[in-house]
């Protein structure tokens, strides 16, 4: 009888330890994993925004095509105004402005072309992975464009790139299924997108990220 009681106590201790872990430590572990993936996704979305902004500067519009954006980043160029010369202390004391110096040929402005990849991302940036959601096997960020007409009748080009929590945290669903469900439900109740996104297809928000 004594052995049976001891066995039950051991089993009870194991069950109690599991319950403590599930109620206290499991959410902490989930938050750590979520933060790790969110940080990587935010960095990716910032790079996407950077690429889209440069594409619009050159082409006058955003693109909803990953292939088009990748080709632009890999092979495209941007205009860069280079200034040759500067005002001397004597010229500044005499009241000469930079505009005056340009008109007199003392300062020259020359426009050159620089590679998008080198100037914005660096040569080691992997363009092919720009569309991929970090920590996933084959999940891809959504990318879309739209033209919104404001209340004053002005047409504004916009873009949006996003990833749902079910994609960002998909590799964790076996261990943290309920935590992911709870996170999505909280976002829904707060009227917010259950994931990370930059830009918007329905409003002009200066290509802001929903984490900012």
Protein language model features and the residues they cover:
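Broad hydrophobic/π-residue packing in well-ordered secondary structure
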Residues: 6, 19, 55-56, 62
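N-terminal alpha-helical signal peptides/signal-anchor transmembrane segments
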Residues: 38-59
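A generic short-segment signal for beta-strand/edge and adjacent turn/coil regions
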Residues: 15-17, 38, 125-127
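Hydrophobic membrane-insertion alpha-helices, especially the h-region
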Residues: 2-23
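Amphipathic alpha-helical segments typified by the pilin-like N-terminal helix
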Residues: 19-40
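Low-complexity, acidic interaction segments enriched in glycine
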Residues: 57-212
């Amino acid at each position: 009888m004594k052995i049976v009681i001891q066995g039950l106590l051991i089993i009870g201790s194991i069950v109690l330890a599991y319950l403590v872990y599930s109620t206290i430590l499991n959410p902490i572990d989930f938050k750590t994993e979520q933060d790790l993936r969110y940080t990587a996704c935010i960095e990716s979305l910032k790079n996407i925004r950077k690429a889209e902004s440069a594409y619009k500067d050159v082409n006058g519009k955003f693109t909803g095509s990953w292939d088009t954006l990748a080709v632009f980043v890999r092979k495209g160029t941007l205009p860069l105004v280079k200034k040759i010369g500067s005002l001397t202390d004597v010229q500044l004391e005499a009241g000469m402005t930079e505009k005056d110096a340009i008109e007199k040929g003392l300062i020259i402005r020359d426009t050159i072309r620089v590679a998008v990849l080198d100037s914005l991302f660096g040569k080691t940036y992997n363009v092919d992975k720009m569309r991929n959601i970090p920590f996933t096997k084959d999940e891809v960020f959504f990318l879309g464009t739209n033209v919104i007409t404001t209340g004053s009748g002005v047409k504004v080009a916009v873009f949006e790139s996003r990833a749902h929590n079910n994609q960002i945290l998909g590799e964790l669903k076996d261990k943290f299924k309920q935590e992911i469900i709870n996170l999505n439900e909280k976002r829904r109740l707060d009227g917010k997108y259950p994931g990370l996104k930059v830009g918007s297809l329905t409003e002009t928000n200066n290509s802001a990220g929903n984490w900012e």
